[in-house]
Amino acid sequence: MGIVKIKDKTFKTSIPEADILKKVQVVADRLNQDYADKTPVFLAVLNGSFIFAADLMRMITVPSEISFVKYASYEGTSSSGSMKTLMGLNQDLTGRHVVIVEDIVDSGFTMAHMIEDLKKKNPASIEVCSLLVKPGNLKVDLDINYAVMEIPNDFIVGYGLDYDQEGRNLRDIYTIVEE
């Protein structure tokens, strides 16, 4: 089991990259089946989902598009609950099937805000595809039909997720070690 130190925190390996990729493939297969007769628009939420989105999109075999949006609700190790749009979407989504690609759904505030913003663009449908979901920490009611993994309410880094902007490049997912 690997241990990494990022700034003032210590993390241990909790989900190896090989396990992540196997589970991403399962979700990609479902998306390929469900969108076989559609051309979905995948909206990757930056910065955290960039590695997940890249791996997922290489597994998607149906015609599709990808765009990027950026929201922020994290500072340090806890979700602030505050919301601001940093980089929006300029693409016309009218009548399109939208799949939001997110790294982690924690409190759900960011995702609920994004869904409300996207509904104003009149898409045919909106689905959520999240690498990780913390069901025990959800504060809002969300339908997450494409969850790769559910995890406990631990703080994690790696595979795109960060601690104060560091650790995104780690290939595995690491859980904080309580000191």
Enumerate the language-model features and the residues they cover:
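PRPP-associated nucleotide enzymes
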Residues: 1-179
